[in-house]
């Protein structure tokens, strides 16, 4: 199985590293516009093989999309990173043209591929990729919810002092500081609601920390995070290539689900060999429904900035 990652920056390279190390794909191609950059990252990752024991073929290319031919999954990380103080909305004008061009180029050589969008603002870039390519909605997936849910589980783990892998929790809604919705009511530790262990005040603090998780790291690092985002992409790609049918929160195109239409937004999905196999309907309470509707309105508002690009 072959995976192409467009954009060999921190997130793209980390994704390639995790996919290779875990043997998720037999071949990974890193592509970047900067001369020699993807080649260098690929060579560095390849030189880990003897110490970490993987056999994945990793190669890098400079803007040569012919080398990506036959990719089962294409991951788009291209775009400028989020800078301190920069909103996701401000990224739209810069990144939209990049994502559109990349999506069109990869489809020339991999017409049957599934595209995973990582570029920010992620929900809007996912919507752009869908509309610009005309692909079936199951083949365009935004990664955001997988990362947000991972951060939510991590903060719950810290609050509980229990292993994160024993915690089930999900974030839906837009992939933004004010639009994501950590579902504290449904979070559990080994099947037991976390509300039995944590007070409402602590749960609200966990939710708040989750919502600003990306911004917190941007402030600390001076740029966007990359380890957790890269690992989250690899987790999603694994479920696609190996038809694992995991339920993962992803930004996908909705047509009536959760009362919304004509946007890409984070909802629980079954992810398998066909991409989005199913959108899972969770019975939200009235407060959660209101938050989701508000989140959808915010995402829809950002999409308005795409009108001049999609004409």
From Swiss-Prot:
Active site positions: 175
Enzyme Commission number(s) of this protein: 1.1.1.37
Catalytic class of the enzyme: oxidoreductase
Keywords assigned by UniProt, alphabetized: NAD, Oxidoreductase, Tricarboxylic acid cycle
Signal peptide: none
Residues that coordinate or bind NAD(+): 7-12, 32, 95, 118-120
Domain of life according to the entry: Bacteria
InterPro entries: L-lactate/malate_DH, Lactate/malate_DH_C, Lactate/malate_DH_N, Lactate_DH/Glyco_Ohase_4_C, Malate_DH_type3, NAD(P)-bd_dom_sf
GO biological process: lactate metabolic process; tricarboxylic acid cycle
Binding annotation for substrate: 82, 88, 120, 151
Pfam families: Ldh_1_C, Ldh_1_N
Entry GO MF terms: L-lactate dehydrogenase activity; L-malate dehydrogenase (NAD+) activity
Gene3D superfamilies per record: Lactate dehydrogenase/glycoside hydrolase, family 4, C-terminal, NAD(P)-binding Rossmann-like Domain
Reaction(s) the record says it catalyses: (S)-malate + NAD(+) = oxaloacetate + NADH + H(+)
Matching PANTHER family: L-2-HYDROXYCARBOXYLATE DEHYDROGENASE (NAD(P)(+)) (PTHR43128), L-LACTATE DEHYDROGENASE (PTHR43128:SF16)
Entry similarity comment: Belongs to the LDH/MDH superfamily. MDH type 3 family.
Known function: Catalyzes the reversible oxidation of malate to oxaloacetate.
Name of this protein: Malate dehydrogenase
Organism: Flavobacterium johnsoniae (strain ATCC 17061 / DSM 2064 / JCM 8514 / BCRC 14874 / CCUG 350202 / NBRC 14942 / NCIMB 11054 / UW101) (Cytophaga johnsonae)
Taxonomic lineage: Bacteria, Pseudomonadati, Bacteroidota, Flavobacteriia, Flavobacteriales
Gene for this chain: mdh
């Amino acid at each position: 199985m072959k995976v192409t990652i467009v954009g060999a920056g921190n997130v793209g390279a980390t994704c390639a590293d995790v996919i290779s190390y875990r043997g998720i794909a037999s071949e990974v191609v890193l592509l970047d516009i900067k001369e020699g950059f993807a080649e260098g990252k690929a060579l560095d990752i390849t030189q880990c093989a003897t110490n970490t024991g993987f056999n994945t073929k990793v190669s890098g290319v400079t803007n040569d999309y012919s080398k990506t031919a036959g990719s089962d999954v294409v991951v788009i990380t291209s775009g400028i990173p989020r800078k301190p103080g920069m909103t996701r909305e401000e990224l739209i004008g810069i990144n939209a043209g990049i994502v559109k061009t990349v999506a069109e180029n990869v489809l020339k050589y991999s017409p049957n591929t599934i595209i995973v969008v990582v570029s920010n603002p992620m929900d809007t870039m996912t919507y752009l990729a869908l509309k610009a390519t005309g692909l079936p909605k199951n083949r365009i997936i935004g990664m955001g919810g997988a990362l947000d849910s991972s951060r939510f589980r991590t903060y719950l783990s810290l609050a509980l002092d229990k292993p994160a892998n024993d915690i089930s929790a999900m974030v839906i809604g837009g992939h933004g500081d004010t639009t994501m919705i950590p579902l504290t009511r449904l979070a559990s530790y080994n099947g037991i609601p976390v509300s039995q262990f944590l007070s409402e005040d602590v749960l609200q603090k966990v939710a708040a920390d989750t919502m600003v998780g990306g911004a917190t790291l941007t402030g600390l690092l001076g740029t966007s995070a990359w380890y957790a985002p890269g690992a989250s992409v690899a987790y999603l790609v694994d479920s696609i290539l190996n038809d694992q049918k995991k339920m993962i929160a992803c930004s996908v195109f909705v047509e009536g689900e959760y009362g919304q239409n004509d946007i890409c937004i984070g909802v629980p999905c079954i992810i398998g060999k066909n991409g989005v196999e199913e959108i899972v309907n969770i019975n939200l309470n009235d407060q959660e429904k209101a938050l989701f509707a508000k989140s959808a309105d915010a995402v829809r508002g950002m999409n308005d900035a795409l009108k001049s690009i999609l004409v």
